[in-house]
């Protein structure tokens, strides 16, 4: 979150910096990247359409490959393992605001996608810390003599004295094929231009966790605020504006002399919201399910896949006694944020046991999609075939003969149900005992379940064509795509006996003979 207005106030104090894509010698410094900030910045800077998860995956890979060419000593991506309870009300307010803002749906999925793609496909160094990433980023930057990429004004206030340290705001970056330029900030260099401690300015503007009775100046200009603080320090009246206790707290907030930082990294295999659940200091433990694109009048997409998550919670509970036997889930219900308390005192079960070892003859990307469709209720053959066409087309890299369409409300609901289900299956995979896992870790990280083979625009376009009576064979451009899609479809329908058949789209329509043909 950072300190309100501090980044804007101190923007002129940055110095230009440039990193060439073709350096003659390796750089003397490392690079530490705030994972969540990077994920959101890239999503918005690339103008990603909410349905194009695969396009976002490509953007993540391309940017990492560009950074790799800059020849830093090391590149580390650091992701959150959970938010402190002090941000609970902020989180509640933001969640509620987004319920009625369909444009913001799916955005939070960019963080687990970026983490999985970087760790698995890019083979980058990914670290997950047990709380927010920002303080651990500063800790690692000091340890590695690194530059930090982030979008958090808190980094302006860490007094790190290593030779090459600096904070570069992501929004200051100008990225080209020849390199990256931006603006670099250091606390010690900025401090030289002020006659009072910059932490006093931060405390005056309001640092996270400040006392509720602290009077914060929301309106004065930067110059006027600096004049007030400078005169107050000179006249020794500063405690009338910022108490001694609050200033001590702010200095401690930006101190890196915390022994917990030495042991704050945790399992990088799991996505942040699952890590947050496991490392929650609350009883019961809490999980915030990502918001999806759905109308407030519709049923919550997460309810359908609740049994999958229940088994995941039970597995965590059996392996970690301190986890407890209850979980509090936050999710959307109608047009408001809701929560429910779940008892998770059940026996341990692997993914394959939970899903009855279905589709075991398929490799994991195909099996995950088949599992997802099998767990969705009231599915019809057109919807199922459209998802399979989307998946196979992207998996094989084969285009389809499709036109842009306006998604129907029914199809939007199907997409959100699909995401909720595949996310819940991944949580079940995370919950397995790694020594007795039924799923190969290497196979799971070799593709990103939320982006490798998902582009929901293709689903909407395929569904639109199939609803008009078109055959899947008229949509695909090669026999391999058609054959693989049909094999997956047959396996699904053989197991999913109650799938609703709208029309026999796979059976080619016979051409009626005309009198001319008969003659």
Curated annotation (Swiss-Prot):
Q: Does the keyword Cytoplasm apply?
A: yes
Xref: Pfam families: XPG_I_2 (PF12813)
Which InterPro entries does the record associate with it? Asteroid (IPR026832), Asteroid_dom (IPR039436), PIN-like_dom_sf (IPR029060)
Q: Name one GO biological process term.
A: DNA repair
Keywords on record? Cytoplasm, Mitochondrion
What superkingdom does the record give?
Answer: Eukaryota
Q: Which SUPFAM superfamilies match?
A: PIN domain-like (SSF88723)
Under the GO molecular function aspect, what terms does this record hold? nuclease activity
Q: Which GO terms describe its cellular component?
A: mitochondrion; nucleus; site of double-strand break
Please state where this protein is localized: Cytoplasm; Mitochondrion
Which family is annotated?
A: Belongs to the asteroid family.
Name recorded for this polypeptide: Asteroid homolog 1
């Amino acid at each position: 979150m950072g300190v309100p207005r501090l980044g804007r106030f101190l923007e002129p104090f940055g110095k230009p910096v440039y990193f060439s894509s073709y350096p003659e010698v390796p750089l003397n410094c490392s690079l530490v990247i705030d994972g969540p900030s990077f994920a959101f910045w890239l999503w918005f800077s690339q103008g990603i359409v909410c349905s194009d998860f695969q396009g976002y995956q490509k953007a993540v890979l391309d940017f990492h490959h560009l950074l790799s060419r800059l020849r830093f000593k090391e590149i580390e991506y650091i992701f959150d393992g959970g938010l402190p309870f002090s941000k609970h009300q902020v989180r509640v307010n933001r969640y509620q605001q987004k319920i009625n803002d369909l444009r913001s749906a799916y955005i939070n999925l960019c963080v687990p996608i970026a983490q999985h793609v970087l760790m698995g496909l890019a083979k980058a160094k990914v670290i997950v810390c047990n709380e927010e990433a920002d303080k651990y980023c500063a800790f690692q930057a000091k340890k590695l003599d690194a530059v930090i990429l982030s979008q958090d004004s808190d980094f302006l206030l860490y007094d790190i004295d290593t030779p090459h340290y600096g904070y570069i705001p992501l929004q200051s970056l100008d990225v080209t094929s020849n390199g990256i330029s931006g603006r670099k900030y250091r606390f010690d260099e900025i401090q030289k231009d002020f006659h009072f401690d910059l932490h006093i300015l931060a405390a005056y503007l309001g640092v996270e966790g400040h006392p509720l009775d602290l009077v914060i100046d929301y309106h004065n200009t930067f110059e006027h605020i600096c004049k007030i603080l400078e005169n107050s320090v000179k006249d020794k009246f500063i405690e009338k504006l910022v108490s001694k206790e609050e200033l001590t707290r702010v200095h401690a907030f930006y101190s890196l002399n915390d022994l917990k930082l030495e042991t704050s990294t945790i399992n990088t295999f799991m996505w942040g919201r699952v890590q947050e659940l496991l490392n929650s200091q609350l009883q019961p433990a809490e999980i915030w399910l990502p918001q999806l694109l759905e109308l407030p009048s519709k049923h919550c997409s997460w309810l359908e896949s609740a049994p999958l998550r229940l088994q995941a919670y039970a597995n965590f509970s059996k392996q970690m006694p301190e986890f407890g036997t209850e979980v509090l889930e936050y999710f959307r219900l109608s047009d408001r944020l809701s929560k429910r308390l779940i008892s998770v005192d059940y026996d341990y079960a692997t993914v394959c046991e939970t899903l009855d070892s279905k589709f075991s003859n398929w490799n994991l990307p195909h099996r995950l999609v088949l599992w997802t469709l099998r767990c969705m209720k009231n599915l019809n053959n057109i919807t199922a075939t459209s998802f399979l066409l989307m998946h196979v087309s992207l998996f094989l890299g084969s285009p389809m003969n499709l036109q842009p369409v306006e998604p129907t409300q029914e199809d939007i609901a199907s997409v959100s149900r699909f995401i909720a289900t595949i996310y819940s299956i991944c949580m079940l995979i995370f919950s397995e005992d790694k020594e007795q896992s039924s799923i190969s870790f290497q196979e799971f990280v070799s593709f990103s379940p939320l982006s490798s083979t998902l582009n929901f625009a293709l689903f909407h376009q395929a569904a639109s064509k199939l609803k008009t009576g078109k055959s899947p064979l008229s949509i695909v451009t090669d026999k391999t795509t058609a054959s693989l899609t049909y094999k997956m479809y047959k396996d699904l329908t053989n197991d999913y006996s109650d799938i609703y058949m709208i029309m026999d789209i796979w059976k080619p329509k016979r051409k009626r003979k005309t009198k001319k043909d008969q003659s």
